[in-house]
Amino acid sequence: MKITLSKRIDLLAFLLPCALALSTTVHAETNKLVIESGDSAQSRQHAAMEKEQWNDTGNLRQKVNKRTEKEWDKADAAFDNRDKCEQSANINAYWEPNTLRCLDRRTGRVITP
C-alpha cells in the first residue's frame, strides 16, 4: 500500500492538532496559592512534642555539661599543680604525668610543693 505525499500531509495535518490538544490538557497549570498562618493543630502538636523532648533531655544535657566542666577543672588543677611542683624548692619533688601528682623521689609519696 503506497502512501502518497499528499496523504502524508493530510494525516500530519489531522494528527498535529490532536497532539496539541492532548498536550495542553496534560500540561494544565494551576495558579492557586495556599497561605497558612503556621498555627495549625498539627504544628502546635509538633511544637509541643519537641518541647517535651527538649525537657526530657535537659537532665542529660546538664549531666554532660557538668562532667565536661569537672574534667576541665581537673585538667586545669593538674596543670597548676605541675607548675608548682616543677618550681618547688624541694629538689626531691618531681611530677608524675601518669597520675598527675607531685611525688618525692626518695619515698614515692605525694608531697605538697
From Swiss-Prot:
InterPro entries: DUF1283. Keywords: Signal. Residues 1-28 form the signal peptide. It comes from the Bacteria. NCBIfam families: PRK13659.1. Belongs to the UPF0482 family. This is UPF0482 protein YnfB. It comes from Escherichia coli O157:H7. The gene is ynfB.
